[in-house]
Amino acid sequence: MKQLRWKYDYHSNPKEVNKHWHILCGHNKEECDTAGYDWADEMFDLFKTKFGFKDKYMVEDYVRIYCNAHTHGLEPHMHTDDGDFTMIYYPRLDWKSDAWGGGTLIDGQLVPYKGNRLVVFDAYLDHKAMPVSRECYELRNVVVFKCNVKDANHERLDFYKEN
């Protein structure tokens, strides 16, 4: 993940001003492969099989995969996501959560950043990345999988789009 070409100027909530580092991997296998992020599509397939996404969540595929990153001084905003489920993977095995912070606040509950952890939650829940300590000189990065339930009624998503 350290070798990726990050772009700054992305915000999780268009109504807010704070931005963070971001990479769009793709909306499907072909886009991920073409852009050089085949590993992201393979990661999703591994998680899908290992954790039984189809049986547990009725999820067969992703809508998009992207990577987000934060450094000290970036203050993330609370937001909700489009889609049915958001899945956040913490890849950094060397992350020192107690000293550096950088977890995720989901519906008022802090989920500490722990390397090789996959967090799955309803996309409509308020959430945000937590700030990174000024004692941290590392990039707090995550891989995010946005997913919809197969054949779901997505009427509730209109509420998100209007607000």
Predicted regions, residues:
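Alpha-helix C-terminal capping segments
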Residues: 51-57, 79-81, 103-106
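Conserved short histidine dyad/triad with adjacent acidic residue
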Residues: 65-82
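Catalytic core of Fe(II)/2-oxoglutarate
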Residues: 67, 93, 97-163
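Glycine- and acidic-residue-biased ligand/ion/polar-headgroup-sensing regions
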Residues: 85, 91-94
